[in-house]
Structures are given as structure tokens and as C-alpha cells.
Curated annotation (Swiss-Prot):
Reaction it catalyzes: (6R)-5,10-methylene-5,6,7,8-tetrahydrofolate + NADP(+) = (6R)-5,10-methenyltetrahydrofolate + NADPH; (6R)-5,10-methenyltetrahydrofolate + H2O = (6R)-10-formyltetrahydrofolate + H(+)
Recorded superkingdom: Bacteria
Name this polypeptide is given: Bifunctional protein FolD
Pathway(s) this gene product operates in, as recorded in its UniProt entry: One-carbon metabolism; tetrahydrofolate interconversion
EC number of this enzyme: 1.5.1.5, 3.5.4.9
UniProt GO cellular component terms: cytosol
Binding site for NADP(+): 166-168, 191, 232
UniProt entry tagged with the keyword DNA damage: no
GO molecular function: methenyltetrahydrofolate cyclohydrolase activity; methylenetetrahydrofolate dehydrogenase (NADP+) activity
Length: 298
């Protein structure tokens, strides 16, 4: 068996195209474009790349991009004041504070200061609570992107066995909740799970989100499983090379001989995250203006 490659890059491109078309319609109805504000504190090179990419994608989707770059020694008081200002700005529909923050800033208190209605990252405890009880809110971008890929590949997930490896608030826990809401039978596995290979072996759907390079081996997988690899890890460089390869949490090459479908790294889940961020911003804009947006439109 050779697995079908789930092309997240192509799916994300189609999603961004739909979001852009709907953003144009929103502008015609509201007299303004949807707006996304991204706040970067410090000069972390990886974060700077992420923010730059988000800005480009926002503009390409017919949205306004507001970028705020603050020095690494920014005080909590100053950062909270900026968040408060953005909460009250009618041109801003979504607010994203790029993580990680410098050590002297408490991430949870900063996220808690963002209006839940503008929390397009879905990290606010109110949005986490809304997800857990089935109320309308914002879902973290990466797990929602994973669900879109699964729905596109499998359709109805009812009754399927799903194992989520990882229990973070950003991916693992919301991913499990989304699968449960889709009527899958869900197990959350983690570092203390006993007999992890046996647990994974019974799953029709495996979502790996632990940040350990190629941890999930092919012998762990059920024949015909669908594998979503959220991990992104850089291996040590090979002799003569400056940088090592990027790999996921799954041994992709050998797992592809067992799974029915699998996401690659890179090019699988990663591109979906920014596309879903734009989708969430579009949804926030419609809600903020009281304009209907059909749920199946995006």
C-alpha cells in the first residue's frame, strides 16, 4: 500500500481563495475590509518570519493588515494597553499576539486581555469553554485546519476510532474536542500513556502533535489509517550540510507504506494554519458587523 498524500498546501490555497472572494463581498456590504492586527514583541527570527508571512497572506486575501512590532523589553502594562486599544478599534476584527513572548511577560494574562470576539487564534479561555460545551466561538487554527483536511478526505467521521497524541491547549485538547463533536470515538494519548503503540494501532485516525521527530513508527499504525502529522522538527544536519531536514512526528517514508492517507511535513498541516486564521478573521468581521455568513461558505 502506498498512502495518498494529503496536500494541505493545495487545500489551503483553495481556502484562501474562497476567503478572499468573501472578503470582497464583505467590503461591498460593510464599507470596509476585514482587519487583522498582529502584535510581535521582541526580535525572535522565527516569529518575525511568521508575522511577515501572515501579513502577506492577509493582504492577498483582500483584508487589512495591522502590524505592531514592540521591543523585547516592553512592559506588560504597555502591551495590555495596546491590546485594549485594539479591542476597541472597529477596524480590527481579529487580534493575534505572536507567541512565544519574552520571559518577563505572562502569556496567559495577555491572551486573557484579548476580546473573545476578536480572539481569532482561539486561545482565550472563554473560546476554549465555548468549544467544550458546543457553543459558537473561535477554534484554534491548527486543529480546525486538521479537521478540514479530515472531512475532505473521509467525509463523515461518525464511529471512527481516533487517537490524538499530545494534549496541549493549542492542538491536542481542541483537536480531541473537534473529533468528539464529529462523533468519532476519541482517545488522547500523551507521555504517560501506557502501551502507546497498542493504543495507536487501533485508530482509524491518528493525529500526532507532540514535537518529537519521527516518533510514530509504521508498526504502530493500523493498515489503512489516516494520519495527520502536526509536528515540525528539524533533524541534525548531515555531514557537509548547514541545516538538517524538516520532519514531522511520524516516520513519513515508512508510514506511507501502511497508512491509506498521510500529511507530509512540510506542506501538510502547516499551510492550513494561516489559511484558517484568515477564515476566522473573516468570520469575526461578519459577526462584528452583524452580517450573515453561511456556515458552509468556508
Amino acid at each position: 500500500m502506498t498512502a495518498e498524500i494529503i496536500d494541505g498546501k493545495a487545500f489551503a490555497a483553495r481556502l484562501r481563495e474562497r476567503v478572499g472572494a468573501l472578503a470582497e463581498k464583505f467590503e461591498a456590504a460593510a464599507g470596509r475590509k476585514p482587519g487583522l492586527a498582529v502584535v510581535l514583541v521582541g526580535e525572535d527570527p522565527a516569529s518575525e518570519v511568521y508575522v511577515r508571512n501572515k501579513g502577506k497572506a492577509t493582504l492577498a486575501a483582500n483584508m487589512e493588515s495591522f502590524e505592531y512590532k514592540l521591543p523585547a523589553d516592553t512592559t506588560a502594562q504597555d502591551l495590555l494597553a495596546l491590546v485594549k486599544k485594539l479591542n476597541g478599534d472597529p477596524a480590527v476584527d481579529g487580534i493575534l499576539v505572536q507567541l512565544p513572548l519574552p520571559d518577563h511577560l505572562d502569556e496567559q494574562s495577555i491572551i486573557a486581555a484579548i476580546s473573545p470576539d476578536k480572539d481569532v487564534d482561539g486561545f482565550h479561555v472563554i473560546n476554549a469553554g465555548r468549544l467544550s460545551v458546543g457553543q459558537r466561538g473561535f477554534v484554534p487554527c491548527t486543529p480546525l485546519g486538521c479537521m478540514m483536511l479530515l472531512a475532505d478526505r473521509l467525509g463523515d467521521l461518525s464511529g471512527l476510532e481516533a487517537v490524538v497524541i499530545g494534549r496541549s491547549n493549542i492542538v491536542g485538547k481542541p483537536m480531541a474536542q473537534l473529533l468528539l463533536d464529529a462523533n468519532a470515538t476519541v482517545t488522547i494519548a500523551h507521555s504517560r500513556t501506557r502501551n502507546l503503540p497498542e493504543v495507536v494501532k487501533r485508530a482509524d485516525i491518528v493525529v500526532a502533535a507532540v514535537g518529537r521527530a519521527e516518533m510514530v513508527k509504521p508498526e504502530w499504525l493500523k493498515d489503512g489509517a489516516t494520519v495527520i502529522d502536526v509536528g515540525i522538527n528539524r533533524l541534525p544536519p548531515e555531514p557537509g550540510k548547514e541545516r538538517g531536514r524538516l520532519v514531522g512526528d511520524v516516520d513519513f517514508g515508512r508510514a506511507s507504506e501502511v497508512a491509506a492517507a498521510i500529511t507530509p511535513v512540510p506542506g501538510g498541516v502547516g499551510p492550513m494554519t494561516i489559511a484558517v486564521l484568515l477564515r476566522n478573521t473573516l468570520v469575526a468581521a461578519h459577526r462584528n458587523e452583524g452580517i450573515d455568513l453561511p456556515e458552509d461558505a468556508i
